[in-house]
């Protein structure tokens, strides 16, 4: 193997640049040429390929986003479009492809491997932490820290005004950001897609807190359950005198300098991706489990089910009495 390529696909996540840096530097260390594909699979189809060298990845480990840009490519579901992507790889002599992204990105890599025998290695990069085969995805820790910073600031003003605040966080159909940030932020209530909840129980908890002199109430809401305005309306219908505000954090959770954890995780995964290609392995997804970097067959990785951390959720209920 002489030349490898790398792309980032789907939603961006802090730490992607650290992974790109690791792939490029490890590849060069082992004597490989490294090509960058701009804008994910869309750029692969459109032949947007650049050379990546040591200077290309200098001064990027601390930056959020991705220097390769990213885009969603619905057209990639069509076989004739995927053929164009394969032709781009052939044109540039790319013998191995590293794909950083979520499960949709992995499925794109899976199809390239199955249809055109492309050597592919996948790295989980998504703030949602919803990839079943790995304990943590690149970007999750940074996103949680961003949410924590917001919770801390919102609590300051909520306490001053004796208010309740709903904070809506990202995660699609996964409640991991809400759960981890909610526990770390001392939220009074965490509402997740994975757990049944009751609006009456929530309102009773707020009422009890007010009676015992509590100055604020922080409710962390995962976007996959409902929107913050919808929840606010439900609460106000039952507690019309409650001073209630809501904040939708939105895409601020995707940006910012990656944390130490995300930089180290991305560096480990990026280096391992190159090593796997040099070992002639393909269709692998790199993960971290029990603090060890491991890899799984992509078919198995996509069929796994993410285990919800119910113990942590139960702990959140104990700590929020």
From Swiss-Prot:
GO term, biological process aspect, one: fructose 1,6-bisphosphate metabolic process
Activation/inhibition comment: Allosterically activated by ADP and other diphosphonucleosides, and allosterically inhibited by phosphoenolpyruvate.
Annotated positions binding Mg(2+): 103
UniProt KW keywords: Allosteric enzyme, ATP-binding, Cytoplasm, Glycolysis, Kinase, Magnesium, Metal-binding, Nucleotide-binding, Transferase
Reaction equation(s) it catalyzes: beta-D-fructose 6-phosphate + ATP = beta-D-fructose 1,6-bisphosphate + ADP + H(+)
Signal sequence residues: none
Residue positions binding ATP: 11, 72-73, 102-105
Keyword Metal-binding: yes
Gene Ontology cellular component annotations, sorted alphabetically: 6-phosphofructokinase complex
Residues the record lists as binding ADP: 21-25, 155, 186-188, 212, 214-216
Coiled coil: none
Subcellular location: Cytoplasm
Gene3D superfamilies: 3.40.50.450, Phosphofructokinase domain (3.40.50.460)
Family note: Belongs to the phosphofructokinase type A (PFKA) family. ATP-dependent PFK group I subfamily. Prokaryotic clade 'B1' sub-subfamily.
Subunit structure: Homotetramer.
Stated name of the protein: ATP-dependent 6-phosphofructokinase
Organism: Caldanaerobacter subterraneus subsp. tengcongensis (strain DSM 15242 / JCM 11007 / NBRC 100824 / MB4)
Lineage of source species: Bacteria, Bacillati, Bacillota, Clostridia, Thermoanaerobacterales
Gene label: pfkA
């Amino acid at each position: 193997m002489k030349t490898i390529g790398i792309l980032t696909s789907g939603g961006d996540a802090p730490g992607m640049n650290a992974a790109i840096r690791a792939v490029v530097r490890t590849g060069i260390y082992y004597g490989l040429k490294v090509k960058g594909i701009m804008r994910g699979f869309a750029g692969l189809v459109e032949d947007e390929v650049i050379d990546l060298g040591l200077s290309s990845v200098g001064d990027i480990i601390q930056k959020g986003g991705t220097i390769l840009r990213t885009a969603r490519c619905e057209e990639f579901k069509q076989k004739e479009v995927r053929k164009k992507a394969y032709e781009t790889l052939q044109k540039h002599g790319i013998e191995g492809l590293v794909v950083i992204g979520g499960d949709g990105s992995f499925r794109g890599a899976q199809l390239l491997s199955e249809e055109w025998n492309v050597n592919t290695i996948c790295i989980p990069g998504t703030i949602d932490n919803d990839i079943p085969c790995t304990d943590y995805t690149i970007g999750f820790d940074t996103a949680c820290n961003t949410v924590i910073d917001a919770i801390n600031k919102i609590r300051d003003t909520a306490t001053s005004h004796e208010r309740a605040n709903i904070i809506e966080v990202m995660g699609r159909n996964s409640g991991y950001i809400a759960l981890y940030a909610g526990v770390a932020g001392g939220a009074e209530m965490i509402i997740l897609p994975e757990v049944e909840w009751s609006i009456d129980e929530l309102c009773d908890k707020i009422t009890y807190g007010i009676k015992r002199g509590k100055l604020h109430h922080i409710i962390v809401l995962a976007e996959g359950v409902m929107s913050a305005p919808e929840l606010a309306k439900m609460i106000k219908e039952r507690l019309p005198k409650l001073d209630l505000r809501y904040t939708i954090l939105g895409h601020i959770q995707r940006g910012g300098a990656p944390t130490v954890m995300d930089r180290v995780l991305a560096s480990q995964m990026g280096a391992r991706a190159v090593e796997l290609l040099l070992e002639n392995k393909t269709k692998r997804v790199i993960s971290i489990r029990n603090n060890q970097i491991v890899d799984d067959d992509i078919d198995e990785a996509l069929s796994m089910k993410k285990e919800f951390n119910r113990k942590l959720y139960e702990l959140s209920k104990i700590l929020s009495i």
